[in-house]
A protein has these predicted regions:
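ADP-ribose/adenylate-binding Rossmann-like module
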Residues: 197, 237-238, 249-274
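Short amphipathic alpha-helix with an adjacent loop that forms part of the alpha/beta core around
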Residues: 219-229
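Cytosolic regulatory regions of ion transport systems
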Residues: 241-242
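Conserved SAM-binding strand-loop segment of SAM-dependent methyltransferases
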Residues: 212-218
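Structural motif
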Residues: 170, 232-233, 258
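Segments forming oxygen-rich coordination pockets for charged ligands
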Residues: 1-199, 206-212, 273-274, 312, ...
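Adenosine-phosphate binding glycine-rich loop
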Residues: 262-325
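A short acidic, amphipathic alpha-helical/loop segment
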Residues: 183-186, 245-250
Length: 325
C-alpha cells in the first residue's frame, strides 16, 4: 500500500525525518529542468520510500516512472556510499510517458540515509536553501544567497539549489464557525501560514494540528491591527460588530495584501456606509473585497461558501493584489 504523507509547510527535510522511520534510506526526487509544457514546475520535489510518498512531481506516468526508478535505485545501490547515490532522469513527456504535455523534464534522484537526514534535520525549522550535487556528494547549505533567489530553485552547472521550505504568505482567518472550519480544512495544505482567530476556544475543532496557529482573542481587531503588511485577511465571524471592528482596524491601518469579508451585497453596502462614517476614505474602502469568493457560486451551504472563498485565495496570491473592490 502506498501511503502519501503531507507536510503542510512544504518542508521536505521535516517530512523526510518523519517518513524515514525504521527504513534505512529513501529517495528525494527534484525537478531540476523543465522545457515546454510539464505537470509541475522547476523545483517541485517528492520523497519516496518503499511504501510511502510525500508530495508530488506531477502524478500520472511521469510520477510512476520516477517512483519506479527511485525504488529501484534504493534496492540497487543501498547504502554503499552514503550521500553520493544520485541519478539524473531525462524524461520526454510525449514519447516516453505517453502524456499529452509534450514537454521535457529532468529529475534528480538522490538517495538519503538515516544519517544524511539527521544531519539535515537542523535546517528543517529555518528557511534556507540547500545545494544538491548532480553527480556525487551530500546536499550542502547555501551560505550566501541574495534575497531574490533565496526562495527560488535554480540549476547551476553541477548542482541544483532548492529551498528547504516554501515561503508562506500569512493568512488571518477570523471566525471558527461552520464556514471557518470548512475553509481551513480545504486550504490547510496550501502555501499559507494560517492564523485562525476566534473569541471562543470552544468554536475550534478538537485536537491539535501543525497546519495552523490557533488564536483565542477577546479583541480580534487588535490582532488585525498588528498583522504584517503582506498578510491576507478573511473575515467570517459570527458577529457583524466583530466584522466591522476588524474591517476598521485593517482599513484604517491600510497595510495588507487582501481583506475579504463574507456577506451579501446588502451587507457590503451597509458596511461601506458605516466605515465611511467612521472615517475610512474611499480609496481605502476600494481595498475591501465583499462579498468574498468567486462570483459563479451562489449557494449558502457552509462547505460551498468555503469552497468559493478558497477558490479566490490563490487568485489573490498569484495576481499579487491586483483584484480589489
Amino acid at each position: 500500500m502506498h501511503k502519501s504523507l503531507i507536510n503542510p509547510n512544504g518542508n521536505w527535510i521535516a517530512a523526510a525525518n518523519h517518513l524515514i522511520g525504521d527504513e534505512k534510506a529513501l529517495a528525494h526526487a527534484i525537478i531540476i529542468s523543465v522545457r515546454g509544457s510539464a505537470p509541475r514546475e522547476l523545483g517541485a520535489n517528492m520523497l519516496i520510500s518503499e511504501n510511502q510518498i510525500w508530495n508530488t512531481v506531477g502524478g500520472g506516468s511521469l510520477e510512476f516512472e520516477v517512483m519506479e526508478q527511485a525504488r529501484g535505485l534504493i534496492k540497487e545501490i543501498g547504502l554503499k556510499v552514503e550521500g553520493s547515490n544520485r541519478k539524473v532522469l531525462n524524461l520526454a513527456l510525449g514519447p516516453d510517458m505517453g502524456q499529452c504535455c509534450g514537454g521535457n523534464v529532468k529529475v534528480l534522484l538522490e538517495i538519503l540515509s538515516q544519517s544524511d537526514i539527521k544531519k539535515l534535520a537542523k535546517h528543517s525549522q529555518k528557511l534556507v536553501a540547500l545545494e544538491h550535487p548532480l553527480k556525487s556528494g551530500a546536499p550542502t547549505e547555501v551560505l550566501r544567497t541574495d534575497d531574490d533567489k533565496k526562495f527560488r530553485p535554480f540549476l547551476k552547472k553541477e548542482s541544483f539549489v532548492l529551498p528547504t521550505a516554501k515561503k508562506l504568505d500569512p493568512l488571518f482567518i477570523y471566525g471558527a464557525g461552520h464556514v471557518g472550519r470548512a475553509l481551513v480544512k480545504i486550504i490547510e495544505h496550501t502555501d499559507f501560514d494560517i492564523h485562525w482567530i476566534d473569541i471562543d476556544e470552544k468554536r475550534f475543532p478538537e485536537g491539535s494540528t501543525s497546519t495552523f496557529s490557533k488564536v483565542i482573542a477577546l479583541d480580534p481587531a487588535l490582532i488585525a491591527s498588528h498583522a504584517p503588511s503582506n498578510a491576507y485577511h478573511v473575515i467570517i465571524t459570527h458577529s457583524h460588530p466583530l466584522d466591522e471592528a476588524i474591517c476598521f482596524a485593517l482599513l484604517s491601518k491600510d497595510q495588507f495584501r487582501f481583506c475579504g469579508l463574507i456577506g451579501s451585497k446588502t451587507k457590503n453596502s451597509r458596511f461601506r456606509s458605516l466605515l465611511s462614517k467612521m472615517g475610512i476614505k474611499d480609496e481605502q474602502l476600494k481595498k475591501l473585497t465583499c462579498p468574498i469568493g468567486i462570483d459563479e457560486i451562489n449557494s449558502k451551504q457552509p462547505v460551498k461558501v468555503a469552497i468559493w472563498i478558497a477558490a479566490q485565495l490563490p487568485i489573490w496570491q498569484e495576481t499579487n493584489g491586483i483584484r480589489i473592490g
